[in-house]
A protein has these predicted regions:
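Conserved acidic donor-binding segment of nucleotide-sugar-dependent glycosyltransferases
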Residues: 282-283, 287-294, 301-307
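Short His-centered aromatic/hydrophobic patch
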Residues: 64-67, 85-91, 109
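Short hydrophobic beta-strand element within catalytic cores of glycosyltransferases
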Residues: 36-37, 267-271, 280
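A conserved mid-protein helix/loop that constitutes part of the nucleotide-sugar donor-binding site
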Residues: 13-24, 172-195, 208-214, 295
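A conserved nucleotide-sugar
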Residues: 30-33, 171, 186-227, 309
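A short, well-ordered alpha-helix in the C-terminal region of glycosyltransferases
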Residues: 310-323
Length: 331
C-alpha cells in the first residue's frame, strides 16, 4: 500500500508536531509513504532525517497553481493508494475527484471545521469521538467517519536545570504549553497566578498574544515568577522539571499537551472545554475546572500535592498506555 500524506500547516502547532510523529512512526513500521509539506526547513529536516521522502510546496491560500500542479504530478506518477490530507487547506489543495481515479482520499480534521473544505474526501478522520459526532451531525455518512486518536513521545529526559531559567529549585512549578492564542486562555492561567504567590510558571509557546500576556504579567505583579520560553521542541526536560501541567484552553479539540503530560508522568489540570472533557476523567487522570475561572483554577492547583499528585500522574500514564500509545495508533 502506498500512502501520500499532505500537510499545509503552520510553522508551529500541535497538529503539525503530531503529523511529524506519525510520519516517522509509519516509516519505522515500513509503510511505503511520501509526504508533501510547506517548505519549513526544520520540518523537512525532521522528516528527511527519519528517512521520509519529502516534497515541499507553498500551499498558498489562493491561486496556487504550482502546488496544485505538483500534487497532481505526484499522484499521477507515484500512484498512491491513499491520499491523507491534514486539515482544511491541504484537503482543499488535493486534486479534485475524477471518474476512474485510483486512490482513496482521506481527510484528517484538526478541529470543528466546515465540511465544504472536505467535499472531495471519501473518508474523514477525527481525533476525538466528539469530532466524529460533529461531522456526522452535519450529514457526513457515519460509515465514512472514523475515530483515530493521537499519540505522543514517551521519551523521558532529565529535568532542565531550573537555575538556567532563574527558578527556585523548591518552588511549585507549573508548565503551560501551546500557541499563545486567545483559544488557549493563558491569560486565565496568568490571572490564577495572582492567587498562587508561591508558584512559578514556565510558559512555552509563541503566538499573537505574546506581547499582551507579557504586559498582563507585569500588570498583575507576577512577572518575576513567570518565564516565557518561546516555542520548544525539547519538551521532555520541561515536563521532568515541572510539578503540574496546566491546560486552561477555552476551546480545545483534543489536547496533545495532556497526552504529553500523561506520557511524562506529570499530573494535569485543565479547563472543561469540549475536547478536554472527553479526554479527562475528572478526579481520576486529571482535574477539570470551569473555563475562564481563574480562582477555581488556582484552588485546584493548590490541591495537587503529595499522594494526590502521584495518583493523578499514575492514572494519566495508565490512560496513555491503554489508548494513546504509538503502537495502538499506528496499527
Amino acid at each position: 500500500m502506498k500512502l501520500l500524506q499532505v500537510m499545509a500547516g503552520a510553522r508551529y502547532g500541535g497538529a503539525e508536531e503530531f503529523f511529524v510523529r506519525l510520519a516517522l512512526a509509519f516509516e519505522r513500521a515500513n509503510v511505503d509513504q511520501r509526504v508533501a509539506v510547506r517548505g519549513h526547513p526544520f520540518r523537512k529536516k525532521q522528516l528527511s532525517s527519519g528517512g521520509v521522502r519529502t516534497d515541499t510546496f507553498a500551499f498558498r491560500r489562493w491561486l496556487d497553481v504550482r502546488t496544485n500542479f505538483g500534487l497532481r504530478n505526484i499522484i499521477r506518477d507515484w500512484r498512491p493508494d491513499i491520499v491523507l490530507t491534514w486539515m482544511s487547506r491541504a484537503s482543499r489543495a488535493c486534486p479534485k475527484p475524477k471518474l476512474g481515479r485510483d486512490f482513496v482520499h482521506v481527510g484528517r480534521l484538526g478541529g470543528y471545521y466546515k465540511l465544504k473544505y472536505f467535499r472531495g474526501c471519501d473518508h474523514l478522520i477525527g481525533n476525538t469521538p466528539g469530532m466524529v459526532d460533529y461531522v456526522c451531525g452535519l450529514g457526513w455518512p457515519a460509515e465514512c467517519a472514523h475515530y483515530l486518536p493521537n499519540f505522543v513521545s514517551e521519551r523521558r529526559a532529565p529535568p532542565l536545570d531550573r537555575k538556567i531559567l532563574n527558578t527556585p529549585g523548591d518552588a511549585p512549578l507549573l508548565l503551560g504549553l501551546g500557541r499563545l492564542h486567545e483559544n488557549k486562555a493563558f491569560d486565565v492561567l496568568l490571572d490564577s497566578m495572582a492567587f498562587l504567590p508561591d508558584h512559578w510558571l514556565w510558559l512555552a509557546g509563541t503566538g499573537p498574544q505574546e506581547a499582551a500576556l507579557r504586559s498582563q504579567a507585569v500588570r498583575l505583579g507576577i512577572e518575576k515568577r513567570v518565564r516565557f520560553l518561546g516555542w520548544r521542541d525539547d519538551v521532555a526536560p520541561l515536563f521532568s522539571a515541572a510539578n503540574i501541567l496546566v491546560c486552561p484552553s477555552r476551546s480545545e479539540p483534543l489536547g496533545n499537551v495532556v497526552l504529553e503530560a500523561w506520557a511524562q508522568h506529570v499530573p494535569v489540570i485543565a479547563a472543561a472545554s469540549e475536547g478536554l472533557q472527553q479526554l479527562i476523567d475528572h478526579e481520576v487522570n486529571g482535574l477539570l475546572v470551569p473555563t475562564g475561572d481563574a480562582p477555581a483554577l488556582a484552588k485546584s492547583i493548590m490541591g495537587i500535592t503529595g499522594a494526590r499528585a502521584e495518583a493523578l500522574a499514575a492514572s494519566g500514564w495508565a490512560s496513555y498506555r491503554e489508548s494513546y500509545n504509538e503502537g495502538t495508533v499506528v496499527s
